[in-house]
Structure formats: C-alpha cells, structure tokens
Amino acid sequence: MSMYNYVKEAWKVPANSYVKELQWARMQDWRKEPSVLRIERPTRIDRARNLGYKAKQGIVVVRVSVRRGGLRKPRPKHSKKPATLGINKITMAKSIQRIAEERAAKRYPNMEVLNSYWVGQDGKQKWYEIILVDPCHPSIKNDKSYSWLSTGNHKGRANRGLTSAGKKGRGLMYKGKGAEKARPGVRANGKKTK
C-alpha cells in the first residue's frame, strides 16, 4: 500500500487509530485559534489531494470552526407565547460544512472554494479544512486542472451552492425516483414553461 492509503485507512475510524491521540492534542490548540485560519499545509493530505489540492502558488488551505447542533436563535425581547418563541429545535437548511465554506469565501473574497473536508469535532464545534483557489493567479490560469475557475462562470460558487457540499444539500447528488423536484433547483422547479 502507498503512504496515502495508510493515511486514508487511519482516518476512516479515527477513534481506532493513532489519529485519536493526534486529534486530542491538536484540538487543544484549535480551540484557542480564530474561527477562520489559514494553515501552511493540509491536515489530511490524502483527502486534500483527492479533492484537488496541489502544493503550488495560488492554492491555500483554511481551517474553519463552526458550531455543532441546531441553529443558535436569539430569544425575542418582547413577550410571546412559549409555543411561538422559535428558539429550540430550529435547524438550518444548509449543512454545517456548507456554512464553513461560505465563511471561508467571505474571509477571502479574491478566492474561490474548490472543496472541503472534515478534520475533527468535539462537543461544541466541528472543524473543516477548505481548499481555496485564486482564479486570477497565472499558475492557476495556465494549469488545465484549474483554469476552468478563471472563466468567470464560477464566481461565488460557495454561496451559490456549486461546491460538492452545496450540491449535496440541494439534492443534486441523486437522480431518479425521489429526486423529481430537485432540478434545476428547488425554487426553480416547476417555473419552466412546457
């Protein structure tokens, strides 16, 4: 097996491998860091390369922490019936991974989100690493693997749900029975003239 396969196997069930001790030590530092932090190299090199990462100019990796669980809704200041408060059991229509991608895109407005992957979680938050690409960098424009990002059709792809996590949340990973109303989008379905 190659080195990447060993890393992949270890990350499949982190609790049963050496990754558990590594993560325990890492998370103590991660909790003290800002919510969006650029890092020098990916934590999971196998997953990053699988999703399109290359160690070259114009590509950076950012680690983002996002809260776990349901949405943190503010409590209304004026009186309301307890039944209509709308605080608990409110969940986002977006996945936490998609929220992480959008926050990374907001912090780096000149870059586009290529992909992202999970790196850890504790009782309060989850951490994702986001691969960002600068579409205007010459090394990106001249690389056929990434030049499609420079065409202009992919601006703000994280906010438009065009990343892998975004498409999954929009129901576009599935086809056939049960996915009839997912295309071209949930809101756009049925608007087309016959």
Curated annotation (Swiss-Prot):
Superkingdom, natural source: Archaea
InterPro entries: Rbsml_eL15_core_dom_sf, Ribosomal_eL15, Ribosomal_eL15_arc, Ribosomal_eL15_CS, Ribosomal_uL23/eL15/eS24_sf
The keyword ATP-binding appears for this protein: no
One term under GO cellular component: cytosolic large ribosomal subunit
Keywords: Ribonucleoprotein, Ribosomal protein
UniProt KW Ribosomal protein keyword: yes
Residue span of region Disordered: 158-194
GO biological process: one example: cytoplasmic translation
GO molecular function: RNA binding; structural constituent of ribosome
Family annotation (SMART domains): Ribosomal_L15e
PROSITE patterns: RIBOSOMAL_L15E (PS01194)
Transmembrane intervals: none
Family statement drawn from the similarity comment of this UniProt entry: Belongs to the eukaryotic ribosomal protein eL15 family.
Record protein name field: Large ribosomal subunit protein eL15
Organism of this sequence: Methanococcus maripaludis (strain DSM 14266 / JCM 13030 / NBRC 101832 / S2 / LL)
